[in-house]
């Protein structure tokens, strides 16, 4: 017969109890995570998922939240996209009303739709020109700032702003650069 100490008996009892407590904590946290993701996504479908699916969904959601740069760019283009969508809906409505109006001249309909298309194209060109002007203005603001003097040991790539340093040759058009 094997002799067991009080410590060994205590460990035999304590280990399963600690495991149950750990699992209970994990389940509670998973339930909290489910409700948080459901609230933030506005989707109650996650509440009916099993634990593995819910964790996968939460990871995907967190990755989407992790990219603030993309979100900021989307937020900047959101009003323009909203306007474009509204404009196109209005153009479609005009087209539908003109097509359903008895006695409407086809030539008049074509000229109205051509005009609306030209206005839309002009608005897009204006927005692109405005974006380019903003980029140029930001570049000029950064290049006019006082730069710290470079030491001979430096790499030569020092800049106090995010935009690239102006090149020595004159540029006719601003070049788009991904940084």
Curated annotation (Swiss-Prot):
Any single biological process term in GO: compound eye development
Superkingdom, natural source: Eukaryota
UniProt cross-references to InterPro entries, sorted A to Z: bHLH_dom, HES_HEY, HLH_DNA-bd_sf, Orange_dom
Motif annotated as WRPW motif, chain positions: 176-179
Region (Disordered): 146-179
Family matches, as PROSITE patterns: BHLH (PS50888), ORANGE (PS51054)
Keywords attached to this entry: Developmental protein, Differentiation, DNA-binding, Neurogenesis, Nucleus, Repressor, Transcription, Transcription regulation
Compartments, as annotated in UniProt: Nucleus
bHLH domain location: 10-65
Outcome of mutating residue 114 to I: In strain: NVIII-2, NVIII-5 and NVIII-m15
Pfam entry (one): HLH
Positions of the Orange domain: 83-116
Record function comment: Participates in the control of cell fate choice by uncommitted neuroectodermal cells in the embryo. Transcriptional repressor. Binds DNA on N-box motifs: 5'-CACNAG-3'. Part of the Notch signaling pathway.
Domain note: The orange domain and the basic helix-loop-helix motif mediate repression of specific transcriptional activators, such as basic helix-loop-helix protein dimers.
Protein name as annotated: Enhancer of split m8 protein
Organism, as annotated: Drosophila melanogaster (Fruit fly)
């Amino acid at each position: 017969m094997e002799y067991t100490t009080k410590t060994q008996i205590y460990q035999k009892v304590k280990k399963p109890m600690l495991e149950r407590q750990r699992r209970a904590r994990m389940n509670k946290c998973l339930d909290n995570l489910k409700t948080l993701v459901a609230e933030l996504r506005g989707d109650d479908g996650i509440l009916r998922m099993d634990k593995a699916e819910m964790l996968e969904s939460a990871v995907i959601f967190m990755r989407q939240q992790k990219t603030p740069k993309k979100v900021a760019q989307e937020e900047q283009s959101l009003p323009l996209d909203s306007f474009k969508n509204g404009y196109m809906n209005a153009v479609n409505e005009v087209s539908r009303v003109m097509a359903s109006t008895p006695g409407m001249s086809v030539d008049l309909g074509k000229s109205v739709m051509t005009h609306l298309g030209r206005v839309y194209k002009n608005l897009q060109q204006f927005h692109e020109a405005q974006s380019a002007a903003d980029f140029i203005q930001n570049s000029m603001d950064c290049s006019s700032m006082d730069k710290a003097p470079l030491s001979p040991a430096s790499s030569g790539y020092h800049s106090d702003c995010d935009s690239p340093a102006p090149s020595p040759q004159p540029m006719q058009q601003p070049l788009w650069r991904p940084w």
